[in-house]
Every structure is written in structure tokens, then in C-alpha cells.
């Protein structure tokens, strides 16, 4: 009789131990589900905050690109690295409203800045008599947003272009 009782207790203990494992697995799964839900909520909040800032910065300009300066100056050679480290690019306005947003930064700081003009650009804003490679092989925009050939060795306002792909 004791042998049957001990066997029963052993089986009950094994069953309870397995039950605890299952409870532990369920608890772990529930914890993971809760953590994923928190991450999803935090991601949605972060995305909303980012888009709010983006929309506020581009409000009234009609541009989906942001043009931001750190108020420093640089030669063209160092500009790509500066912008890249910040997650941006050298400005390359493709539309009039983008050039206007770029111009707003230049006008606010009363300084010129470098930009990149692609070979197949649909939009350009060259000043009269430009481009003129005698002035240099780089391109700068003045405080009115007009483009000029320029020396790549000029220290111009650092402006980087940022855009979002959603």
C-alpha cells in the first residue's frame, strides 16, 4: 500500500512539476507578448513624434525635405561626411518648393551654402550668367536661393538635407 501511495505521490509530483513548467512557459509567453505590445506602442509614439516634427518643419514650405544647419562652415570636401554623420546628404533641391525651403535657411543665416546639381536635374535655379566654371567646379546657393558656380575651397554654411521615406 505504501508503495502505491509513494508511486502516486511521485506521479503527482511529476505532473505538478510539468504543470509548473507549462505555467512558466505561459508566463514567459505572456511576458513576451506584453513586451512586444509595449515596443509597438513606443514605436508608434516615436513615429508620430518624428512625423509631427517633420510636418512642423516643412509646414508652409510644401517641401518633404528638411534643410538644417549646425551654423558651422566647411569646404565642400568635408560636407558629405558632416551630413552623412548626421544622417543627411548635401542639399540637392529637385523642385522649386525644395529650393525655397533651402533658401529660407540661407536667408535666415545670411550665408551661402553648397548644393549638388545632378546631370539630369529637372529643376535648376541658376543665377544670370551661370553656371560659369571659371568661378569653380562646385555649386553654391546664395541667400536668395540662386545657384552660382563656386570654388570648392570656400568655407560656406553647413546645410544638410534630410528626407523621410515612409
UniProtKB/Swiss-Prot annotation:
Report the protein's function.
This phospholipase A2 inhibitor neutralizes the activity of basic PLA2 myotoxins of its own and related venoms. The inhibitory profile shows specificity towards group II PLA2, either belonging to the catalytically-active (D49) or -inactive (K49) subtypes.
Tissue specificity:
Expressed by the liver.
What protein family is recorded? Belongs to the alpha-type phospholipase A2 inhibitor family.
The subunit structure is: Homotrimer; non-covalently linked.
Q: Which Pfam families match?
A: Lectin_C (PF00059)
A GO molecular function assigned to this protein is:
carbohydrate binding
Q: Which protein are we looking at?
A: Phospholipase A2 inhibitor anMIP
- Tell me yes or no: is Glycoprotein among this UniProt entry's keywords: yes
The signal peptide, as residue positions, is: 1-19
Describe PTMs of this protein.
N-glycosylated.
**Intrachain disulfide bonds:** 83-160, 138-152
Q: Which GO terms describe its cellular component?
A: extracellular region
Amino acid at each position: 500500500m505504501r508503495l502505491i501511495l509513494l508511486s502516486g505521490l511521485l506521479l503527482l509530483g511529476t505532473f505538478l512539476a510539468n504543470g509548473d513548467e507549462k505555467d512558466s512557459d505561459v508566463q514567459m509567453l505572456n511576458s513576451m507578448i506584453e513586451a512586444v505590445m509595449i515596443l509597438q506602442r513606443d514605436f508608434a509614439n516615436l513615429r508620430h513624434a518624428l512625423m509631427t516634427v517633420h510636418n512642423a518643419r516643412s509646414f508652409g514650405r510644401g517641401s518633404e525635405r528638411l534643410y538644417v544647419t549646425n551654423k558651422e562652415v566647411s569646404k565642400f570636401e568635408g560636407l558629405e561626411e558632416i551630413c552623412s554623420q548626421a544622417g543627411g546628404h548635401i542639399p540637392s533641391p529637385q523642385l522649386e518648393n525644395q529650393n525655397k525651403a533651402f533658401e529660407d535657411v540661407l536667408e535666415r543665416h545670411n550665408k551661402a551654402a553648397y548644393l549638388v546639381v545632378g546631370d539630369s536635374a529637372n529643376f535648376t535655379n541658376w543665377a544670370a550668367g551661370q553656371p560659369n566654371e571659371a568661378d569653380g567646379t562646385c555649386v553654391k546657393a546664395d541667400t536668395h536661393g540662386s545657384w552660382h558656380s563656386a570654388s570648392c575651397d570656400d568655407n560656406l554654411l553647413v546645410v544638410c538635407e534630410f528626407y523621410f521615406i515612409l
